Amino acid sequence: MFRFATISFVLVLLGLRAVESSAQVTRFQVLKADELVGNVIAMRLPTATGTVYTMTSHCELDIIWSQVVRSSLRTEYTDGLLTSCHTSFRVNDSVRDSSSMIKGADQCFVHPDAAFTCERATQWTTSRLYFEEPVGQPFIFVESVLKDCQLVLSGPNRYTLTFPNRNVNHYIYKEGVLQEIHVERTLMDLVFRRA
């Protein structure tokens, strides 16, 4: 019995190690006026039936007063189709925004608004932008707002994504690999630079 338990434990450890080694991880530094204020870790993990993308960020920003901003995202594809996504955006440990979508569910939710029917025309999401250049994609499904948003080719290997509230992100690629994201917001601009 002890031998069986030991062999089972070793097999579980080997399985976990195989999963970790198959994940693709990319890291970005978050800069505000060339000062390092945080980091982003994005991961793409193949599953038996598709792919899971995760992204976590942590930033310490001074906007009127010091704020710790954390975000997390999990997006899942099954057989190439978007099946679920969940996001959370926290400022000083208080939930500022969150969203949730599950394929087949009648309702989607973006905090703090009421639930709604989620309709989309594309399988491309912001999480995929960390790992793939969106060549020929006119829209990107933005998990935080659960809407398709316009993506425009703004130069060679450069794309501009416009959100419903008119916020803008600029994505810059080199040889198909994301190098930087320029984030334009009302009170500040940030740069996510590949680490």
Q: What would you call each of these model-derived segments?
A:
Residues 24-100, 176:
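N-terminal mature ectodomain segment of secretory-pathway/periplasmic proteins
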Residues 83-195:
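Solvent-exposed helix/loop surface patches that form functional interfaces
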Residues 21, 38-42, 49-53, 63-68, ...:
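Generic detector of short, locally flexible boundary/turn motifs and exposed helical patches
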Residues 1-8:
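Bacterial N-terminal signal peptides that target proteins for export
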Residues 1, 22-24:
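Absolute protein N-terminus
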